[in-house]
């Protein structure tokens, strides 16, 4: 598949607010990206017209009940069959921030045994509580399975911003060690919060900005085709988005977020 043939659906609902930036990141790299309200796809669209699906950040449905749950339930009810086909065909799905919450609520992540009928994890209220909007460091822990990071060297440190009030990744306490081991054994652990030298936060604030278990910032499914992360790569696409650009004498054209978009595009271009 040629780069210009890749067609990305950036799906939004009421409360989504990062759709334009996400589409622009794909456009910058020569890919077709269309922002579609979920109702447009229900009435006149075909999800299978797209090579890839993205759930961007925001506060879908006002984060009522809990973040992502209403969008996930609505999606399952209205487009459940199309989603099933999309997943079964191995087409990539990306969830950023609220999008990650949607994928977890839908049962697509972690997806130890495929799509789960109920959430296997949660992204809950930050600890300490409060909305966190700041730049953080991530370490790529994935060994190559995740299609969104397998062009990024294992151990590489990325600088990307967060903006969320409910980003604390947790497993059920009685199963957390077992589930963590499953993530590691199946190469489903992707990003962990760390300091600028790559040293794990070990739960310490502010390096771990939300109290996430095992400093988890992003995971993928067993096939590596579905990826969710709390940080916003679309907000680290260009040099001028970085907070300290005015104090530097030299800046590269792009930020670290570009690496994630480049990785999935590279993988899609290798498909027939």
Which residues make up each language-model segment?
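N-terminal beta1-alpha1 cap of cysteine-dependent amidohydrolase-like domains
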Residues: 1-96, 100-110, 115, 124-132, ...
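Amide-donor transfer/coupling interface in amidating biosynthetic enzymes
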Residues: 37-45, 83-85, 89, 118-272
């Amino acid at each position: 598949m040629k780069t210009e043939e890749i067609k990305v659906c950036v799906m939004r609902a009421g409360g989504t607010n990062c759709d334009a930036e996400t589409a622009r990141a794909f456009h910058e790299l020569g890919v077709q990206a269309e922002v579609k309200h979920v109702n447009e796809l229900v009435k006149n669209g075909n999800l299978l017209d797209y090579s890839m699906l993205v759930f961007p950040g925001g506060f879908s449905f006002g984060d009522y009940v809990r973040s992502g749950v209403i969008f996930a339930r609505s999606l399952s009810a209205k487009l459940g069959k199309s989603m099933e086909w999309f997943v079964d065909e191995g087409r990539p799905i990306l969830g950023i921030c609220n999008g990650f919450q949607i994928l977890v609520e839908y049962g697509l992540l972690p997806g130890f045994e495929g799509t789960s009928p109920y959430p296997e994890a949660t992204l809950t209220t930050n600890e300490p509580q409060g909305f966190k909007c700041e730049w953080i460091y991530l370490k790529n822990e994935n060994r190559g399975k995740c299609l969104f990071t397998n062009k990024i060297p294992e151990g590489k440190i990325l600088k990307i911003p967060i903006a969320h009030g409910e980003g604390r990744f947790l497993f059920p306490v009685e199963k957390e060690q077992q589930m963590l081991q499953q993530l590691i054994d199946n190469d489903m652990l992707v990003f962990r919060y760390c300091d600028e030298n790559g040293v794990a936060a070990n739960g310490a604030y502010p390096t771990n900005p939300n109290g996430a278990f095992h400093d988890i910032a992003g995971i993928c499914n067993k096939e590596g085709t579905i990826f969710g992360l709390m940080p916003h790569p679309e907000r680290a696409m260009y040099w001028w988005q970085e907070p300290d650009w005015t104090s530097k004498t030299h800046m590269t054209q792009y930020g670290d977020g570009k690496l994630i978009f480049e990785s999935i595009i590279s993988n899609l271009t290798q498909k027939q």
